[in-house]
Design a protein with these regions (language model features):
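Helix-terminus/linker motif at the lipid-water interface of multi-pass membrane proteins
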Residues: 48-52, 111-116, 178-189
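Helix-loop junctions and terminal segments of transmembrane helices
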Residues: 1-11, 87, 146-147
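Alpha-helical transmembrane segments of multi-pass membrane proteins
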Residues: 41-44, 54-78, 99, 125, ...
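Membrane-interface junctions at transmembrane-helix termini in multi-pass inner-membrane proteins
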Residues: 73-98, 121, 142
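Interfacial transmembrane-helix starts/ends
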Residues: 14-30, 164
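Alpha-helical transmembrane segments of multi-pass membrane transport and lipid-handling proteins
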Residues: 23-52, 111, 136
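Membrane-interface helix-loop junctions in multi-pass transport and translocation proteins
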Residues: 92, 103-136, 140, 144
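Interhelical loop/hinge segments that connect adjacent transmembrane helices in multipass membrane
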Residues: 120-126, 138-185
């Protein structure tokens, strides 16, 4: 996505830049929908039938699965905004938002120490809240500073086809790497 946004910036075509951003939002929404469908079908099946979870902790494991899926969806939806910041080379914004994210995660860790409720559920919910705050910060910053992020989302079929092909291969490569690194943990469980 950064590649397409950077190329459009270089061309100086504001309308094409807006279409590229809009298309990237649509593509990420489609990916997010696929993730939700996979988690709600295969993820729940795997959790309930294949995972070795102690008695009485299945409820907490379900919370973690749902909150983790929420974090993943929020992160997917942040990608076009992160790409705009990177393409515009506004690294100070990226640094400040990352600093906020790190601080919030530190507060989550400290808050767990004082939490009277189930720490696993609390952790999952607080990490979802952190992801939501970070997502809103990226969106607010981009909408304020970058013209292409304002306005309505429009659908350009040819651009969706072109960008989703590239993004799909990138997503497949990242997914294979994730399965490679995390698959050992699943198999050992």
């Amino acid at each position: 996505i950064v590649r397409y946004i950077s190329y459009s910036l270089g061309q100086g075509d504001a309308e094409k830049l807006r279409r590229v951003f809009s298309t990237s939002v649509i593509i990420q929404c489609i990916f997010a929908l696929v993730v939700v469908l996979l988690v709600e079908s295969l993820g729940l099946w795997f959790l309930h039938s294949r995972m070795n979870i102690p008695e009485g902790r299945m409820d907490a494991a379900g919370w973690v699965l749902q909150c983790s899926a929420g974090v993943l969806v929020l992160n997917l939806l942040s990608i076009p905004y992160n790409a705009c910041i990177t393409a515009h080379e506004d690294m100070s914004a990226y640094a400040w938002i990352s600093l906020l994210e790190g601080t919030l995660k530190l507060l989550v860790a400290l808050g767990l120490y004082f939490s009277p409720s189930d720490k696993l559920k609390t952790y999952a919910l607080l990490m979802l809240a952190v992801a939501l705050v970070v997502r809103l910060c990226y969106a607010a910053y981009c909408r304020r500073h970058f013209e292409e992020t304002r306005g309505r989302i429009s659908f350009d079929r040819s651009m969706v086809r072109e960008m989703s092909g590239f993004a799909g291969w990138n997503f497949l490569g990242s997914g294979a790497d994730l399965v490679n690194t995390q698959g050992v943990n699943l198999l050992s469980n």
